[in-house]
Amino acid sequence: MNRLYSAPESEASGKAAALFKSIRQAVGKVPNAYLTIGSNAPDLLEQNLQLNAVLGKSSLTAREREAINLAVSEESGCDYCLAAHTPLAVKAGYSEAQTLELRQGFLVDDARIDALVKFVQLLVSARGTLSAQHVSAFKDAGFTDSQIVETIGVVTAILFTNMINRVNDTEIDFAPVKAI
């Protein structure tokens, strides 16, 4: 059950209504997480959507971005984002079994993605500055400085929705995912 106010889409007005209309046109529905964010802080919803649009134009592929989304959402314990992003990861080319691997912080048959999910899980779980060795290992896997910054951008975007959903206990409106 939601802990934060979430207006029904039909009752939204102003910026929230416009954002909800745009989201519905793009994805066919307004996910509960977006209803909650838009009901309480439409400017933040707009910013989050804009950030994700910018990241969609980055040098990171959809496959890489969805690997980050799954690894970070598992690390932070966000069941909602795992349910939302698992089908997107499948659409980006992962099998169901691979989505489970990504959530556990590895990918057996792709060294680059394996390095990516290990890096982002370390980034989210470690306290303080990452060691030069960790950053060098990520670069050695083929990631540029620009891609490191873009990776941090994807982590930032998914952590925002992870935190909203963990505080709100947002009702999941996607197919449930397997526990690991």
State where each predicted segment sits:
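Hydrophobic alpha-helical segments
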Residues: 1-180
